[in-house]
Amino acid sequence: MRVLITGGSGFIGRALVSTLLNSHQVFVYTHKSSVENNLSFPHTVTVLTADSDFPKVDAIVNLSGEAIDKSFLTRNRIASIINSRLHTIKLLKQKYQNDFPKIFIQASATGIYKDSNEELTENGSFNNNFYAKLVTQIENGALALLSKDCFVYLARLGVVVGNSGGIVKNLKYLPRPYFLMGNNYIPYITLEDTALAFKFLLEHHSLCSFDKPYQIVNFCQENYLTLNELLKLCKPQSKVAIPCPKFILRLDKRGHLLLVDHKVKPAFLLKQGFKFS
């Protein structure tokens, strides 16, 4: 397949490029012109910017967007996060206005779900907090592409755990925190399984049967971890954990990602036969 990855220079994007490279032709879009010449991709990967002529492709994986954990979540930052994602969708509609690819995968988040003691599948109820509203706007932007006669996957990612970025990188130079009352369940997925799950959707699309022109897919491990268990997974070498009151996570909206409490199940991936590593 010919696959375009937007946001391919990021934490997840680089892992996905490496995973697809041996069996697919990969194109990477980056909106940062300063990054274009510094990407260390193999010569077989074509890097595109907004000024490029976009090649015909079979599928797009949209990972593009400003990182949530970059700085404090002010009102302007939240607007910037949303706009950065919707801008890429708008650009893709312009570039492929006459021949849109048949598969479009939009990176989303499990933060859309309401806290629950029950197991949540892709049909889970939505929360009403600002994260859920943010995710809903992004998903609606992707679903607008249904008018282009393409199939849309909404990939709802849990916290992605990998050594090269995300929560592991943020904790790298800090002692491992241990939160009092940190027994809330956090959906998570390893970076390796994240990339493999995207690859699985691309390669198994023709084998799946659907009753609608889009599919929600939970990207999270099938086992559940509490907040403190997740932090231990992220810093297994840390022998000492520093007790912390949970209220400090409420001081910044980014901390709300670790305050959720829901057991999200990757029902679609499991049903289709995906094997977690």
Regions found by a protein language model. Give the residues of each.
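Conserved beta-loop-beta element that borders a ligand/cofactor-binding pocket
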Residues: 140-163
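C-terminal amphipathic/interface module of NAD(P)-dependent oxidoreductases
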Residues: 239-240, 256-277
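N-terminal Rossmann NAD(P)H-binding glycine-rich loop of SDR-like oxidoreductase domains
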Residues: 3-22
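Mid/C-terminal beta-alpha module of Rossmann-like enzyme folds, strongest
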Residues: 2, 204-252
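NAD(P)H-binding glycine-rich loop region in Rossmannoid oxidoreductase-like domains
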Residues: 35, 40-87, 91
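Conserved Rossmann-fold NAD(P)-dependent oxidoreductase catalytic core, especially the SDR/UDP-sugar
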Residues: 89-129
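A conserved pocket-lining segment of Rossmann-fold NAD(P)-dependent short-chain dehydrogenase/reductase
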Residues: 170-193
